[in-house]
Amino acid sequence: MVDPTADDALDATARIARDLIRFDTTNYGEGKSNGEADAAEYVAAHLTRLGLEPEMFESEPGRVSVIARVEGTDRSKPALVVHGHTDVVPAQPDNWSVDPFEGVIKDGMLWGRGAVDMKNMDAMMLTALDDIQVAGKQPARDLVIAFFADEEAGGVLGSHYLVDTHPELFAGATEAISEVGGYSIHLNGARAYLLQTGEKTLVWVKLIARGTAAHGSHLMRDNAVTKLAEAVAAVGRRDWPIRLTDTTSQLLGELARILEVDPQKVGPDELAIATGTASRFIQASLRTTTNPTVLTAGYKHNVIPDTAEALVDIRTLPGEEDAVLAELAELVGPDIEILVLHRDIGLETEFAGPLVEAITGTLNTHDPGAAVLPYLLSGGTDNKALSRLGIKGYGFAPLKLPPEFDFPAMFHGVDERVPLDALVFGRRVLTDLLLNY
């Protein structure tokens, strides 16, 4: 009996993704990171073996991005950027059932930090290029292949750095594909794929409360921790109103049609919930979210600190960020300082055009009859940086998933994993798209 975990039994996509997971490229944020250098050298070596000439760009020591260009048969066509990132968010090993950086193969899945975010797509990019070379073919247009650093901290040292300092790398490109789209969901017994055509605005803020330092036994009304706790509770409990963007309106209309319900009688949240596990993303795309994520205060049990801080991850619908920040100031009150640490734009592009048609056609070739639907991502990607060069970005990392697989829960979650069969599917779909578009 063949061992399904043996190297010769694994698709090359799984082997490469496993190798990449074994590079601990943890990005802790606020400038703290293990760096991407080892992973960057790995992908650069692979690209070199394919006869390409990858360039490595180091924005700060250890923070390395890799870019290569694949020449197409018709260079008059606009180039397509195909990009991934090699950094990952932290993982707490004690919470996992496997070592998050071992790249364990079990239960028909590849486990590890980055298995879906997004070393799976990094691997699919490399094996798709392998397949194109083995076939002795060229893509129809130039491809700009990018492996960015620092996406998990907003891309300041990765995609934004390259857009600022080396925009010529993306010369001639008008469109891009990357993560968090192209994955399947199940609706009314049928499969559909969500193509990401928009992203929410990103605002990361720090709340700072100040008070009076004192002995822990004192009666203290001017307590920084109490002030911060009240502010954090107000922010976290705020239920922001639903507003439908063009993308979300189109998605909900298609969901109502597939589910055979009257959209006038079924609300947006109900339609989102009907998408199953994808509702984690879709419900969040209906409204702004403000989630406190980190609290910092104090240094000893019996000392009242004079400062307390909280980090809040704000994702607004495109165009709402200024109004949300103004309301945030009202929510926390005048005693709380709001420091904006990072801010990036929201995106929304049309669900139409030759690339969307090519994606839909390629998916239908590999999964006949499946619907392809647009959606607004509740998070963000490096497409934000590329948009500054006029490049329209889409989320398309194709994966055909089991109905019960909670894909959104894998992002930044415990026991992150991806089905091996989905990687094989993604490789085939991506290869065909890159060859024929």
Predicted regions and their residues:
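Short beta-strand segments
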Residues: H83-H85, F147, I177-E179, I208-R210
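Acidic/His- and Gly-rich active-site-bordering loop/insert found
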Residues: V2-R113, I132-R141, V312
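Short pre-catalytic strand/loop immediately N-terminal to key active-site residues, enriched for Gly-Thr
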Residues: K106-D117, A370-L373, V414-D415
